[in-house]
Each structure stands twice: as structure tokens, then as C-alpha cells.
Amino acid sequence: MVTDIQARNARVPDGKTGAFPTLRTIQPADVEACGRAAYEAHRTVAAAHNYPPEHPSVEFSIGLIGNKLKDPNAWGILAEYDGRILGSVFLNLFPSTPVAVIGPLTVDPAAEGGVGRRLMQAALDEARQRGIGQVRLVQSPSHLRSLALYVKLGFEVREPLLLVHGAPPATAAIEGCVVRRATPEDALACERLCVTVHGFARAFELRSAIEQKTATVVERAGRISGYATAIGLRGYAVTEATDDLKALIAGAPAILGPGFFVPIRNGALLRWLLDNGFRSLWPAMLMTAGAYHEPSGAFLPSIAF
């Protein structure tokens, strides 16, 4: 773990001011300032490319940082100089998986000279010290500087994604597929399916979604062939085949949040969504550092991975 003492020794110059920001752990008193910095960073990028903002308001950004700080499975640090916060990053842990996820990473647009790189390197070092061999993130291609940074740090592009928005097409039910709410008794079958598709189970997220009653399963011939923790940015789905994904989307109680990510390489699914009234919002890329298991079935990633 990066301590404040280590952080003070890990200084990087700011390209515009010549200042030397330091890194330290995020404290409750930092939440509002970190949230405002995150909002401005995302607003600037979205406005430059005419994309809908990922952070729709300052209050949203402050709430996001506050929730991350309260999460026992999240670790966050910030960069500051002379009391001004220049950026922050979180490393998100997923119990029962070999994966950690970096994000959100935000850097003040006025801060240059390696602030983002130092924050990213600290997060990667933290993952390494925790024995985590797979680190992932979802990157917006509109931000070319961050893409170059991630590549330099060893990340590989694994899946081009498209955020889509729409309503569940209830009239497009898939023949032979039955969608229902997931129950605790379904968990083991779902976990085995996730291992088949991704190489590991995401049991913590799955069981939390079942408790919150957002998880659904799809059955064919009385056998579970896929599941979703939710259809939305915060949920993910794992299935044997694309038709199972279509069924989960068509049978979803609602689309949670602004939409969900679709792997662009799954052309059959993307065409089906567009034919059923979904519209594209913005592109993104799933990137990974370390080991990676190429999915063997069909899936929808969350905003994390």
C-alpha cells in the first residue's frame, strides 16, 4: 500500500507550473474537492467530443467519490500541490476474483507533466502488492492522452465497446428462452457458467445482485444458459450464446442508468439492438494488464469490466 510518506517521496513536476504534486490517501474531507475535480475533467472531455457527459452533475461526481471512499473494496489516492487537488484514482477490488479495476481516474485538465501517470502507477503498484495479477479498466477513446498512457503502462485493448441506450424490447422475446428473476439456489449454476466463459466466477457481485433482486437468469429447456446481475452500466451478463443475451435484454425489468456496454465484435447482438430501437451513445474500450482469458461465450461487461 502507498503510504503518505512514500507518496511524499513520489513527486512529479507539473508541466505548466513547475510544481511538484504529492500523492496521499483520500480522506473524507477531500470528497467534495475530488468530486468537483472529477466533474470538470469529465465535462471538458465530453464537451470537446460532443458526447453525453459520463458525470452529469457536480453532485453526481461528489456522490461517486463519496461512495468509493466508503467502499471497503476500494482504495483511493489523490495528487495535490499547495492544497489544490490535481487528480485522483481508485483501485477497485472484486472479492473472489483475480481481477482489480482502476477507475475513475481523473486529472485536472490544467495539470500536466505526469500526474495521471503517477496516479496510475501507484494503483498498479497497489494491485501488485496485493497479489492481483489482472488489472482492467474501461477507456473512452475520445481521450487520446489517457489511451497513450495506458498503453505505455502495459495495458492491451481487449474489446471495443459501444454504450447503447433504449428500452427492453418486450415484443422481441427469443423463442425457446425463458427469463426469470434469479434466486439464491441459482448462484452455483451461474458461477459455473461464469467460470466457463471468463475463467473465474464473479460470485460477490452475483450474490449481491440476487439479494438486491436485480439479477435475472435465462433458461433453455429448463437449464440456466445465462444470467445478468442487471442490464445497465453497473451490471454485467454472462451467457452461452448471443440469443441468451438477447433474451435477458428483452426480458429485463428495466435498463438501469444511461445504458449498457455492448462488445462491438458481437455484430449479431449489436444489429439486433439497433433494429429494436436502441441508439448508440459513445464508444469505449475494455483494456487489461496482466493475464487475460478470452471469453468463450457471449457477455456484456459492466462499466468496471
Regions found by a protein language model. Give the residues of each.
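Intrinsically disordered, low-complexity, positively biased terminal segments
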Residues: 1-21, 28, 69-70, 74-76, ...
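Short amphipathic alpha-helix that is part of the acyltransferase structural core
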Residues: 2-64, 158-161, 170-201
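Active-site-proximal cofactor/substrate-binding loop regions of enzyme domains
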Residues: 15, 24-127, 131-132
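Short, structured interface segments
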Residues: 147-171
